[in-house]
């Protein structure tokens, strides 16, 4: 992370976006902010004109401590010349956020790990590969188009709010 330290100390304004696929509603990308973000979730929603902005806590999303954006905020905070930083995560939901979909997600991870650590039948391997692929990059064209549209809307909203574009 030495590079991040160097870059953050020499740049006036930084927009850091960590991209994830997996959790959340299937057809709605979530913007997941750090617990260190100074603005409230409501302010961010209004300022970037994006409908689904969450904080990084159990009330909004699922509680995380120690992920990339948290680390970037801590590095920046310790810098002798901190950047004007906005670090966030774009979470592209792939399976959906129901209890059943969460179980399917867990199943995909377990099956993939099982394949990795122990030889399985070719049928099991194919099934497991299909599950894990759909969890991280759905094949459905509608999903891909919506993910692109959401990404574009959120990135434009952030860049306009931070006055990087008009």
Indicate residue ranges for each PLM-predicted region.
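C-terminal accessory segments enriched in acidic
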Residues: 1-166
């Amino acid at each position: 992370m030495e590079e991040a330290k160097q870059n953050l100390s020499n740049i006036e304004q930084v927009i850091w976006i960590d991209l994830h696929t997996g959790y959340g509603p299937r057809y709605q990308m979530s913007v997941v902010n750090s617990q260190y973000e100074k603005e409230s979730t409501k302010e961010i929603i209004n300022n970037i004109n994006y409908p689904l902005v969450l904080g990084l806590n159990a009330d909004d999303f699922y509680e995380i401590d120690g992920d990339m954006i948290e680390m970037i905020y801590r590095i920046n905070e310790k810098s002798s010349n901190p950047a004007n930083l906005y670090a966030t995560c774009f979470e592209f939901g792939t399976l959906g956020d129901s209890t059943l979909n969460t179980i399917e997600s867990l199943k995909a991870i377990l099956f993939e790990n099982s394949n990795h650590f122990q030889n399985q039948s070719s049928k099991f391997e194919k099934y497991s590969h299909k599950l894990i692929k759909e969890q991280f990059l759905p094949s459905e064209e509608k999903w891909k188009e919506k993910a692109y549209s959401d990404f574009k809307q959120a990135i434009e909203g952030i860049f306009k709010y931070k006055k990087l574009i008009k």
